[in-house]
Amino acid sequence: VHDHPLVRDVLISGGDPLVLPDDEVMRFVRAFAGLAQIDVVRLCTRAPCVNPARVTRELAAMLGRSGKVWVNTQFNCAGEVTPEAAEACGNLVRAGIPVSCQTVLLAGVNDSAEAMLALFRALQRARVRPYYVFQCDPVAGIAHFRVPLERARQIERACAARIGGLGLPRFVADLPDADRKTPISEL
C-alpha cells in the first residue's frame, strides 16, 4: 500500500475478518487506518447476520475510534434481519461506523420483488443501507441458485417502482474481466 499512493480505500476480507479475535482485527485496522493516504478501511463480514453476538459494543467502539472503518455485511432475506442482528448493526452505527449490505440474488430464496422489498425495508429499519444486489457468480455446484438476467432485471425494475432513495441498492454483476461492478441493466 505504501508503494501505491493512489490507494485510498482498503478492503479487509478474504474470508470473514470477524472470525479473528478483537486484537487481531484491530491490528489490521490500525495498520491501514494509520496511513495518511487511506480514507476508508472496509470490513466485509457476515457476523452481524450469522453471529451477531460477535459484534459487541466494545468491538464496535474500538473499530469506530479509527474514524475510517466502514462495514459491508451480507443479508439475503428479511428473516435474517433478526432483533439480534439489528442490535449488532446498531452497535456499529452507534459507534459511528457506516453499515451497508451486499445481497446475493438467489433463486428460491429472494428472487422476487416482494422478498427483496421486505429485505430492503428490514435493513433500513436496522439502519443498514442496502448497497448492492449481486448476480450469483457462476461457481460450480450452485447453478440452481442463479437467477436469469432477465428475471433479475424485472426484479430491479419492480423494486425501483416501489422504493427509492437509500432503500434501493444497485443490481450488479461481478464479472471476471471487468474493472468495476457491472450494472445488470448493461448486460
PLM features: what roles do these ranges have?
Residues 153-187:
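C-terminal accessory regions of radical SAM enzymes
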Residues 11-13:
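Short glycine-rich or small-residue beta-strand-to-loop segments that form or flank ligand, phosphate
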Residues 17-18, 48, 176-181:
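Short, internal active-site loops enriched in acidic
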Residues 1-9, 18-163:
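Conserved AdoMet/S-adenosylmethionine-binding subsite of the radical SAM
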